[in-house]
Design a protein with these regions (language model features):
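Conserved glycine-rich cofactor-binding loop
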Residues: 13-15
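Substrate-binding pocket helix/loop in short-chain dehydrogenase/reductase
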Residues: 97-98, 105-110, 201
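C-terminal substrate-recognition "lid" of short-chain dehydrogenase/reductases
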Residues: 118, 212-237, 242
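Active-site helix of classical SDR
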Residues: 121, 157, 165
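Alpha-helical segment proximal to the catalytic Tyr-Lys
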Residues: 126, 170-174
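Residue(s) in the substrate-gating loop at a strand-loop-helix junction
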Residues: 141
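Short, small/polar-rich loop/turn modules that mediate ligand/substrate recognition or access, typified
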Residues: 173, 178, 230-232
Length: 243
């Protein structure tokens, strides 16, 4: 019997993170989800993942804290033996026009969206290197490629993830570790529900609909499990927006 792969997903208790967890679970992966919430709030996500017939585990810690990440990743390895797949999905927005943006708005977004990817990847990739295999997916955004008014902090953090992805792909390709990014466009989540006039956004999307969490999850599953020769890519999943 083939040993199950184990996937770690940050920000995995809801939204895109949970959708990706479920997609990987349906493909037979055991799932470790991280979030900043407590175990009680994460339990519905754990139950939903377990219903796919796999094991699911929850670890609550701040992904932007280097020490907390190292402690918890070491604990995961001790308890589960390995991490085959890492999805750096944790992220926040603190939008505002640049002239009105203050330092806390800037720093909080960079810390959660970009610094966390460094912290978690730094802890996990050491084990992947020893195993000489692994798949890392960073959840970027279409605005990391093209920018967006009112999102200087968010756009910068997501652009940083693309550079981070390409650099690690070059550094770790010889160790059979693939590193890619996914760049969602407008996806039906609680975050985009706050945007207001969706019809205006739909005018710019050739496919004339918002994306779904499942649209993103299928690409993540492809990068994690279905390809062995794709690395260093930032794949836009945006219905043709920006072409």
């Amino acid at each position: 019997m083939t040993e199950r792969k184990i996937a770690l997903i940050t920000g995995g208790s809801r939204g895109i993170g949970l959708g990706c967890a479920l997609e990987l679970a349906k493909a037979g992966c055991d799932i470790i989800i991280n979030d900043i919430c407590d175990a009680e709030k994460a339990q519905p996500a754990i139950d939903e993942i377990k219903a796919c017939g796999v094991n699911a585990y929850f670890y609550s810690f701040d992904v932007s804290s280097y020490d907390a990440v190292k402690e918890n990743v070491d604990k995961m390895i001790a308890e589960h033996g390995k991490i085959d797949i890492l999805l750096n999905n944790a992220g926040i927005t603190r939008d505002g026009l640049f002239l009105r943006m203050d330092m806390p708005q800037w720093e909080s977004v960079i810390k959660v969206n970009l610094t966390s990817a460094f912290c978690v990847t730094n802890a996990v990739i050491k084990y992947m290197s020893k195993a000489r295999q692994g798949a890392i997916i960073n959840m970027s955004s279409i605005v990391g490629r093209h920018g967006n008014a009112g999102q200087a902090n968010y756009s910068a953090s997501k652009a940083g993830l693309i550079g981070f992805t390409q650099t690690l792909a070059k550094e770790f390709g010889s160790r059979n570790i693939r590193v890619n990014a996914v760049c969602p466009g407008f996806i039906q989540t609680a975050m985009t529900a706050e945007l207001g006039n969706i019809d205006e956004y739909l005018k710019a999307i050739p496919m004339k609909r918002l994306g779904t969490v499942e649209d993103i999850a299928k690409v993540v599953k492809f990068l994690a499990l279905d390809t062995e020769y794709v690395t260093g890519q930032a794949i836009e999943v945006a219905g043709g927006l920006m072409i």
